[in-house]
Regions:
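Phosphate-binding site recognition
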Residues: 1-306, 310-311
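A cross-kingdom feature that marks ATP-driven nucleic-acid transaction machinery
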Residues: 268, 276-426
Length: 426
């Protein structure tokens, strides 16, 4: 029976590792594409097939290559894995139609299994959309996402629960990053050895990633830098980045969203057409890099590692973590109420009486009930003042239940009061 699978997700998220597990455990042909064009990639795939079959030949077209594989699949089970297929899509506009024709006229009645993968998420999702050549052709597809805080913590089980939140806030849930963390060392020691020290594995990761994906690294870097340092509205980002054109900035942002670096967040209850939106740096390592490293490049060159960390990062790390803590708390609620949650997100509005913007960390509809949560990454337990503050924020909303998340617990713990230990006790 023919199968056509599509595996996609941002770079470093573990697609190739998963495909190589299939290659290792099953009778498979594996080929990694590059951006050197159709002919080069055809020659490369031909060589891989020839080695697999143990015969010496080349094919003049993908049609002839798959004709041969279809014949072989009548007597043996064959899985063909084409990794980073989006490189081919970038360099050849016809490859989607070529593949469609091969599937429709050669593979549908064969026993061949074909799996393609891609790191350019937007390109894959566009290729699968209505009226595109590959629409409706896949028998299975899987988007690989970075781990959430809970799954990421399995890479550093020996860390305290507070440090698990800190590790996630800096390194996120991309397996390539989390796999490098040494949980016998502190967060500070890992940041120094993995990011700050000369020759550290992630010292140039952000710029390398951008150079692989975009042409104008400097402009994209300025946009990410603006967001990481507080600009969240389109106008603000356009001005602070120096692009000074919201239309152009919007196009840059769209690609950064596609790459999984930036996200567009809508206020709770708003539709996807709403203008009540903000932009945030989604990838934690990117956010850390542009918050602490990029804008202090000169100091990093002059100072030694310990002095740089103590001067630039140490005092502000927990402030940095507090923002990510809200995301961790949202993901906790998604896990805890996975079967009954209807909507969850940050909520902001303008209070006309106070003449200022009000933000609620988490609003949630679960099992037809409305909830509001306050998240505090502070060294003090949550007490009356913070609870009273949230009550005032939602005073205009009827039938709402309140809850709290705290790094250091509560003066009085009620049913919907969660501390850091609760986050990892699911």
């Amino acid at each position: 029976k023919f199968e056509f699978g599509i595996l996609y997700g941002q770079k470093r998220v573990g697609k190739t590792r998963l495909l190589l597990e299939i290659f290792k455990n099953y009778n498979s042909i594996y080929n990694l594409c590059n951006e050197m064009g159709l002919e080069y990639n055809l020659k490369q795939l031909s060589d891989v097939v020839a080695k697999y079959i143990n015969e010496s030949f080349t094919f003049d077209s993908f049609d002839l290559l798959f004709d041969y594989l279809v014949k072989k699949s009548k007597t043996q089970k064959i899985i063909v894995i084409i990794d980073e297929f989006t490189y081919l899509m970038k360099t050849n506009n016809e490859i989607q139609s070529i593949l469609q024709n091969i599937i429709d006229h050669k593979l549908l009645n064969s026993n061949l299994k074909l799996i393609i993968s891609g790191s350019h998420v937007g390109m894959i999702e566009d290729a699968l959309s209505y009226q595109k050549p590959l629409y409706g052709r896949s028998t299975f597809k899987m988007k690989i996402e970075p781990f959430d805080y809970y799954d990421a913590s399995k890479f550093y089980l020996n860390a305290s629960n507070e440090d698990k939140v800190r590790f996630y806030s800096v390194f996120g849930g991309v397996p390539f990053y989390t796999d490098k963390i040494d949980d016998s060392l502190s967060v500070e020691e890992n940041v120094k050895s993995l990011i700050i020290e000369d020759g550290a594995i992630f010292e140039d990761e952000v710029n390398f990633f951008l150079s692989q994906e975009v042409r104008s690294v400097a402009t994209y870097g300025k946009i990410i830098n603006a967001i990481a340092n507080g600009a969240t509205r389109l106008n603000e980002i356009s001005t602070k980045s120096g692009v000074n054109n919201t239309g152009t900035t919007s196009k840059y942002l769209d690609l950064l969203i596609t790459l999984g670096i930036v996200e567009k967040e809508y206020s709770f209850g708003e539709s996807l057409n709403s203008k009540k939106t903000i932009y945030l740096v989604k990838d934690q390592l990117f956010r850390f890099f542009f918050r602490f490293i990029e804008k202090h490049k000169t100091q990093k060159v002059i100072m030694n590692t310990d002095y740089f960390y103590d001067s630039i990062i140490k005092e502000y790390l927990d402030e940095f973590v507090s923002f990510e803590f809200e995301k961790v708390c949202r993901d906790f609620l998604k896990r805890k109420y996975s079967m009954t949650i209807e909507e969850i997100g940050r909520y902001w509005y303008n209070d006309k009486n106070l003449k200022k913007d009000i933000e609620i960390d988490i609003m949630m509809i679960e099992n037809k009930k409305l909830y509001a949560f306050e998240c505090k990454w502070s060294d003090k337990p949550i007490g009356y003042n913070i609870k009273n503050n949230l009550e005032n924020k939602v005073a205009h909303i009827d039938n709402i239940t309140l809850g709290y998340f705290s790094k250091k617990g509560f003066e009085e713990k009620d049913e919907l009061c969660f501390d850091v230990n609760d986050l990892y006790n699911l």
